[in-house]
A protein has these predicted regions:
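Structural signature of transmembrane alpha-helices in multi-pass secondary transporters
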Residues: 24, 55, 59, 139-147, ...
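Extracellular/periplasmic helix-loop-helix junction of adjacent transmembrane segments
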Residues: 34-59
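Central cavity-lining transmembrane alpha-helices of secondary-active solute carriers
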Residues: 53-67, 311-320
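Interfacial helix-cap and linker-helix signal at transmembrane-aqueous boundaries
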Residues: 38-39, 69-70, 156-161, 295-296, ...
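Hydrophobic transmembrane-helix bundles of small-molecule transporters
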Residues: 160-275
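Loop-to-transmembrane helix entry
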Residues: 45-54, 230, 301-313
Length: 371
């Protein structure tokens, strides 16, 4: 199975996708690298995890909506909407006077992230079909460039200027993406898309409430209220009830408009993808959110050193990911490589939990030698 022919339209779309994934990949790394400086400036250390949790809620909700909204808005309009939200959220983050405003800005960014990420994945599938792995390779490189270069730059900005410049960097990236999108990418919809104007409103509401309850327990439990308290019990029961109502709604509604078609749970492939994505998300959160924070807060490193360590990890992740992706596309054995990925993620999490300090010390040693 050869490499697909790249027409001018595909090249423009792939270039746009490269910049888009660079934009959405940079946010987490800028926040985590500048985390200690942000907390020292704005306070609210106990709410550090909420910055990422609230974004996760809005990403999850937006991704569930995107399949329906993109049918109505078109590809370019969906991307433009997401970029404008991302632009606004980063301006808000750059000028945030307190932690509350920063949390709100990350919630907004999650909305933009969800629109952008879903639209990029849909466009690549439509352009490349069975050879979409080559399109994903381009997006992986975009993630890699963002993950390798941004932590170093963010650390340098924090030490020499202010953490707020990291957000202005994201604003500049959004402007570049918007200019490329408006000038080069036509808006289009697919002929086979449904003309139904119905939305799964109940499913959206129940899913938001269920996810919010879960995040509330995990973010504030043991901090704002005790784990074994009435507040925790009420939140847990609320989350369970909302989740049950969500599943019942999705089972009874027309599966063509459901945001979570229950029939998908019968697919072993989709369930395997969900498990793999969960493992990858846990691993990525540990690597890119908490390791830079841990290095600065507990190990006493500088923001630049934490950024350098993150860049080393990101470089290795990108290289091995690209090799596996190319091998998977050529072999067309997706399930085998998916299993390899899940096992690798699990092993990585165990190694991080056991050897976190020695691992980081090795990264710092390389950083010191390079300096």
């Amino acid at each position: 199975m050869g490499v697909p022919e790249l027409s001018r339209a595909k090249m423009i779309t792939l270039t746009l996708c490269f910049f888009l994934v660079f934009f959405i990949a940079s946010d987490t790394l800028i926040l985590s690298t500048a985390s200690v400086s942000i907390l020292n400036d704005l306070g609210g250390q106990q709410h550090y995890s909420l910055i990422f949790s609230i974004r996760g809620i809005t990403i999850a909700v937006t991704c569930m909506l995107c399949g329906r909204l993109i049918d109505r808005m078109g590809r370019r309009n969906m991307l433009l909407f997401g970029l404008l939200i991302g632009l606004l959220s980063n301006v808000l983050g750059a000028t945030a006077p307190n932690m509350l405003v920063l949390v709100v800005s990350r919630a907004l960014y999650g909305l933009g992230y969800g629109f952008i990420n879903a639209a990029v994945m849909i466009m690549i599938n439509e352009l490349f079909g069975k050879k979409s792995g080559y399109g994903y390779l381009i997006t992986l490189i975009g993630y890699g460039v963002g993950n390798v270069g941004v932590p170093l730059l963010a650390g340098w900005l924090v030490e020499n200027y202010t953490w707020r410049w990291g957000f202005w960097l994201l604003v500049a990236s959004a402007v570049v993406c918007i200019a490329l999108l408006v000038s080069s990418c036509p808006n289009y919809t697919m002929l086979q898309e449904s003309n139904s104007k119905k939305l799964d409103v109940k499913g959206i509401i129940y899913s938001v409430l269920a996810i919010s309850g879960l995040v509330g327990v995990l973010s504030f439990g043991g901090k704002s209220f005790a784990w074994l308290s009435l507040t925790t019990l009420v939140l847990v029961l609320f989350t369970i009830v909302m989740f049950v109502l969500f599943i019942r709604t999705e089972k009874n509604i027309d599966q063509n408009i459901a945001i979570f078609p229950v029939s998908m749970m019968r697919s072993k492939v989709l369930m395997g993808c969900a498990i793999g994505q969960f493992c990858m998300s846990v691993n990525s959160t540990c690597l890119y959110v908490y390791i830079p924070y841990y290095m600065q807060q507990e190990m006493g490193t500088t923001a630049t050193q934490a950024g350098a360590a993150t860049s080393i990890i990101s470089f290795m992740t990108t290289v091995f990911g690209a090799i596996l992706l190319v091998a998977m596309v050529k072999a067309q054995r997706h399930s085998v490589f998916g299993l390899i990925t899940v096992v690798g993620e699990a092993i990585a999490l165990v190694l991080i939990s056991i050897f976190i300090s020695p691992t980081l010390s090795v990264c710092l040693l390389y950083t010191s030698d390079a300096a």
